[in-house]
């Protein structure tokens, strides 16, 4: 089940963008926002504040990708590192089967979603390399989310 809402930051000076307009589109994103807001290693963060153009394999057109997060972290050795973060369920981080038993509408949607996500992530990785950043995909494993 997907939850969305407005996040109210406790440290608006850390937020890159308008701190009055922070929206989460899932509880996983909200959990990561709390981490960014409260963790002292996170110097700066933003939610959907970066735009990366990408070529969609589905329609062959240029689209705009808004990654979930931008974060700037002070590492243990004192160096500063910047990341672009995408929060996704683990099941959406691998391709659907190429030869399913039945090619259902759900399967076609999964194939389309996978193709578009793969293109977004490829362009995000290239964009990050050019901008001295690193692209990461966080799943429920990284966010320490357990299912009952």
Walk through the language-model features, giving the residues of each.
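Electrostatic, structured charged patches in enzyme active sites and in nucleic-acid/phosphate-binding
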Residues: 1-148
């Amino acid at each position: 089940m997907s939850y969305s809402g407005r996040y109210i930051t406790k440290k608006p000076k850390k937020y890159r963008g308008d701190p009055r307009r922070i929206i989460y589109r899932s509880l996983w994103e909200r959990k990561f926002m709390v981490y960014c807001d409260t963790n002292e290693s996170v110097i700066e963060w933003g939610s959907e504040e970066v735009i990366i153009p990408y070529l969609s394999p589905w329609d062959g057109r240029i689209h705009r990708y808004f990654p979930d997060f931008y974060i700037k972290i002070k590492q243990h050795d004192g160096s500063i590192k910047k990341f672009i973060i995408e929060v996704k369920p683990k099941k959406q981080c691998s391709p659907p089967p190429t030869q399913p038993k039945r090619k259902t509408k759900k399967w076609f949607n999964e194939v389309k979603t996978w193709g578009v996500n793969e293109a977004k992530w490829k362009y995000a990785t290239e964009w990050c390399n050019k901008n001295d950043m690193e692209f990461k995909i966080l799943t429920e494993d990284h966010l320490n989310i357990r299912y009952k």
